[in-house]
């Protein structure tokens, strides 16, 4: 007796969700596998990229364009503010491109309950990944218990989907960067991420290298903020980044193709 999935939409949706989860887990297994930039192809570089649009004045038309670029170039994901998650999920339906939503963006200063609610809403709307901003004030005050509890709440609310924690490296001392990376690993999140791109600075090679040294070889490290050209993207990967967040994704991949064609 055969089961007709087309007559069982609930089962079909469950199967789709399962395959998305498996795909996400598979990507995490390779989170620490940094490619050799000398042999990196444009397609492989595209698979590092969260194609990002987080401007306050982004319109529905801008989001459509973002998704079209992601489909064409096969970027790993599209990263947007929470209000656009549903539209992005619809635009990317039938593709392998994931949907990522920011939470607590860009300051990270709202309550933990608010971040939890925002995370749950994003997952309900179809997000496959969450990029949450850390509460920097609590971290700087030495309230590690608060920071860890808040991050664990977000991880729980994400319901096993990967969580990336934005630590805003430009506002931290070296010691704080090390401490917060350790907290992120302990929280159950899957990535530590450099920056929002909305503060006083973005990703640096030195910060990415320090983050990689702190979290170890198998944990995800995402570089974001100020990555606008191919050489910067490659430098971040060489330093240990396993994901890149950028709005200049198309130019970055095109730049690598041009470098390869020039020999």
Question: Across the structure, where does each feature detected by a protein language model lie?
Answer:
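Short hydrophobic "strand-cap" motifs at the C-terminus of beta-strands
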Residues: 224
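Alpha/beta enzyme core
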Residues: 39-73, 83-105, 111-221, 229-250, ...
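Short N-terminal alpha-helical targeting/association segments
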Residues: 12-18, 42
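N-terminal beta-strand-loop-alpha-helix module at the start
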Residues: 80
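Short, charged, intrinsically disordered terminal tails
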Residues: 255-262
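Short, compositionally biased "basic patch" segments
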Residues: 29-43
């Amino acid at each position: 007796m055969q089961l007709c999935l087309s007559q069982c939409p609930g089962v079909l949706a469950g199967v789709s969700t399962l395959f998305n989860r498996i795909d996400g887990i598979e990507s995490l297994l390779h989170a620490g596998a940094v490619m050799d930039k000398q042999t990196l192809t444009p397609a492989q570089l595209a698979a590092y990229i969260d194609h990002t649009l987080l401007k306050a004045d982004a319109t529905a038309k801008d989001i459509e364009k973002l998704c079209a670029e992601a489909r064409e170039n096969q970027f790993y994901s599209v990263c947007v503010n929470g209000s656009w998650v549903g539209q992005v999920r619809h635009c990317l339906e039938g593709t392998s491109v994931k949907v990522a939503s920011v939470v607590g963006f860009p300051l990270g200063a709202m309550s933990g309950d608010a971040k939890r609610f925002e995370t749950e809403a994003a997952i309900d709307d179809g997000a496959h990944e969450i990029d949450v901003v850390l509460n920097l004030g609590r971290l700087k005050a030495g309230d590690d218990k608060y920071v860890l509890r808040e991050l664990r709440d977000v991880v729980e609310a994400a319901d096993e989907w990967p969580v990336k924690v934005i630590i805003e490296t430009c506002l931290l001392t070296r010691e704080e960067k090390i401490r917060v990376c350790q907290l992120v690993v302990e929280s159950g999140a899957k990535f530590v991420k450099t920056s929002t791109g909305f503060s006083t600075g973005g990703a640096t090679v030195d910060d990415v290298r320090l983050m990689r040294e702190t979290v170890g070889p198998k944990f995800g490290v995402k570089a974001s903020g100020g990555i606008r050209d191919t050489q910067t993207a490659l430098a971040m990967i060489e330093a240990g980044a396993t994901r890149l967040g950028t709005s200049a994704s198309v130019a970055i991949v095109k730049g690598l193709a041009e470098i390869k064609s020039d020999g």
